[in-house]
Amino acid sequence: MALERSEVEKIAHLARLGLNESDIPQTTETLNSILGLIDQMQAVDTQGIEPLAHPLEATQRLRADVVSEHNQRDAYQAIAPAVESGLYLVPKVIE
């Protein structure tokens, strides 16, 4: 599927791109090459191939899940203007 000039102009308009007259031929060529690549990928037979969440079968080294900060909720709420039942009270904004 090859795009024509009018289709590229329409795509540029919908994407709110300002293309100069001199840019349209190269943009058309670039979009056509992208669509060609998509056609090549769609032509590959993927029947029987299990989908991957990530193309590399690498495992990530994760750090240990340890507490690095202590709970300072009481200290923060002590300086808050209004607190009730552990929640910060704020002025009503929507009626």
From Swiss-Prot:
Gene3D superfamilies: Glu-tRNAGln amidotransferase C subunit, N-terminal domain. One of its GO terms (molecular function) is asparaginyl-tRNA synthase (glutamine-hydrolyzing) activity. The keyword Nucleotide-binding applies. Keywords: ATP-binding, Ligase, Nucleotide-binding, Protein biosynthesis. It catalyses: L-glutamyl-tRNA(Gln) + L-glutamine + ATP + H2O = L-glutaminyl-tRNA(Gln) + L-glutamate + ADP + phosphate + H(+); L-aspartyl-tRNA(Asn) + L-glutamine + ATP + H2O = L-asparaginyl-tRNA(Asn) + L-glutamate + ADP + phosphate + 2 H(+). One of its GO terms (biological process) is glutaminyl-tRNAGln biosynthesis via transamidation. The keyword Coiled coil does not apply. Its EC number is 6.3.5.-. It comes from the Bacteria. Allows the formation of correctly charged Asn-tRNA(Asn) or Gln-tRNA(Gln) through the transamidation of misacylated Asp-tRNA(Asn) or Glu-tRNA(Gln) in organisms which lack either or both of asparaginyl-tRNA or glutaminyl-tRNA synthetases. The reaction takes place in the presence of glutamine and ATP through an activated phospho-Asp-tRNA(Asn) or phospho-Glu-tRNA(Gln). Belongs to the GatC family. Heterotrimer of A, B and C subunits. This is Aspartyl/glutamyl-tRNA(Asn/Gln) amidotransferase subunit C. It comes from Ectopseudomonas mendocina (strain ymp). The lineage of its organism: Bacteria, Pseudomonadati, Pseudomonadota, Gammaproteobacteria, Pseudomonadales.
